[in-house]
Regions:
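Acidic/glycine-rich beta-solenoid
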Residues: 1-166, 171-219, 238-239
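Short, low-complexity export/processing leader segments characterized by acidic and small residues
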Residues: 230-238
């Protein structure tokens, strides 16, 4: 049962999708410090399928995260066995810096627990993360603005480079892969290019992509209260 809240916390969200027109919703519950502690998912055929729960330490750092979801590659909507504990994460800190995440859920879904050491995350003196064992990131380099300029991976098969202007705005990203051509992404304001070809540009209501007839397809986005995209749509080309 949903309980109304009068302190600004959202107690429930409701939505439908065009594919089945089924009403789905989350009920949200908070602790005494207004931190979310539980999110219960409901629909007429999928009760509890995507539930989540959270706990924190005294500094507000996340200690445990439990999340249900799909635990097979191609889940069937009406097969409850295809859904279960996707993430059951325990977090370890040194002060307020995360040092280790242990997953007791399905390791190939949700968070990928790629390491099992005492120090899975390392930081520099400015607090920037310099390595991430779970993502096989061996070294991250930063500039004087504390922005990443180079990311090296343990496999040594790829390196990512970033270029910025003097204000810290990102200008270019290069993914250099061993034995393969590099992939360049360039950022010119709202215009995004890949390997010198325009991919899209942003506008106030979404973005536009070039089509094969020398024009642009405009995609419009409906966002929630946090700015997350909940719906993308474009005009019907036949109308």
């Amino acid at each position: 049962r949903n309980t109304k809240l009068y302190n600004g916390n959202i107690s429930q969200s409701i939505w439908k999708t065009a594919s089945d027109n089924s009403t789905r919703y989350y009920n949200y519950y908070y602790d005494d410090l207004n931190r979310i502690k539980r999110a219960n998912y409901y629909s007429w055929s999928e009760r509890s399928r995507f539930n989540g729960s959270f706990s924190y330490d005294k500094n507000g750092n996340l200690l445990r995260l439990y999340r249900r979801g799909a635990v097979v590659e191609n889940p069937e909507v009406r097969n409850y066995r295809d859904y279960g504990t996707m993430d059951n994460l325990n977090y370890t800190y040194d002060g307020n810096q995360l040092t280790k995440v242990k997953d007791f859920g399905k390791k190939q879904y949700g968070f990928i627990d790629g390491a099992d050491t005492d120090q899975e995350y390392v930081y520099d003196l400015n607090g920037n993360m310099t390595s991430d064992a779970n993502k096989e990131i061996s070294k991250i380099y930063y500039n004087h603005l504390n922005l990443p300029t180079k990311i090296e991976f343990e496999t040594k098969r790829s390196v990512i480079y970033y270029t910025y202007d003097a204000t810290g705005s990102k200008l270019k990203k290069e993914v250099a892969r061993y034995g393969l051509p590099s992939k360049f992404t360039e950022y010119a304001g709202n215009y995004i290019y890949e390997n010198n070809e325009l991919q899209f540009f942003n506008h106030s209501e979404g973005y536009a992509t070039p089509n094969n007839v020398g024009k642009f397809d405009y995609i419009y986005q409906y966002k929630d209260h946090l700015g997350n995209v909940r719906l993308s749509y474009t005009k019907n080309p036949n109308s």
